[in-house]
Curated annotation (Swiss-Prot):
<comment type="similarity">
    <text>Belongs to the UPF0502 family.</text>
</comment>
<dbReference type="Pfam" id="PF04337">
    <property type="entry name" value="DUF480"/>
</dbReference>
<dbReference type="InterPro" id="IPR036388">
    <property type="entry name" value="WH-like_DNA-bd_sf"/>
</dbReference>
<dbReference type="InterPro" id="IPR007432">
    <property type="entry name" value="DUF480"/>
</dbReference>
<protein>
    <recommendedName>
        <fullName>UPF0502 protein VC0395_0676/VC395_A0574</fullName>
    </recommendedName>
</protein>
<dbReference type="InterPro" id="IPR036390">
    <property type="entry name" value="WH_DNA-bd_sf"/>
</dbReference>
Length: 216
């Protein structure tokens, strides 16, 4: 895969993709609108507090790489930006609406399960069910031209595995596995503590009963 993004570039691209679909009347976006979208509290993980200068610097880097273009008119005082991330005339990355919706949501929120993605992409595309969502994710993970997403180790106590995009580089699977193991150990320790507390409560109840009988 040729496109590699920094976390801030991923946020900017994700926002431009999202707003192109959800608010077409206000797209391309001004710098102010794009900054607001980047700092949005809903459908963002993590929530950021970027300045316009930070967003501007990121956009200029993306323009230099031809992943974003300035669509403002010649005599306009306000720049308006649109993404050229995919589906451009000469670009190699071609995505259908479902694939683009999933990639957009992964860029904006990081690792998610197929169920979460089906719900969170409802304004971007449509999936019949979770199985269809997972099938599209698997297609993105097994592209002949290079994987765009990867399936992560399943977390303890979870029914579904999460998927993560690969536009910010390879995912450290060992770190995710370690995190899952730590969560499993923590869950096991918590269960043991609960059992110990329950046993102590029984002992206290028995002692109370003995004292009451003795005093009675």
């Amino acid at each position: 895969m040729n496109i590699q993004l920094s976390p801030l570039e991923a946020r900017v691209i994700g926002c431009l993709i999202e707003k192109e679909v959800t608010t077409p009347d206000h797209y391309p976006l001004t710098l102010n609108s794009l900054t607001t979208a980047c700092n949005q509290k809903s459908n963002r993980e993590p929530v950021l507090n970027l300045s316009e200068a930070e967003v501007q610097d990121t956009v200029e880097g993306l323009i230099a790489r031809r992943l974003v273009s300035d669509e403002s008119s010649f005599n306009s005082r306000t720049s308006k930006y649109q993404h050229r991330f995919c589906n451009t005339e000469f670009g190699d990355l071609k995505l259908n609406q479902q694939e683009l919706g999933l990639i957009c949501c992964l860029l904006l929120r990081g690792a998610q399960t197929p169920g979460e993605l089906r719900t969170r992409t409802n304004r971007l595309c449509t999936f019949t069910d979770v199985k269809e969502t997972e099938a599209v994710l698997e297609r993105l993970a097994n592209r002949d031209s290079g994987a765009l997403v990867v399936k992560l180790p399943r977390e303890p106590g979870k029914r579904e595995s999460r998927y993560h995009h690969l536009f910010c580089g390879e995912v450290d699977m060992a770190a995710f596995a370690t995190s899952s193991d730590n969560e499993a150990n923590a869950s096991s320790q918590y269960a043991e503590l609960e059992q110990e507390v329950a046993a102590l409560r029984e002992e206290v109840a028995e002692l109370r009963a003995l004292i009451e009988r003795h005093l009675g």
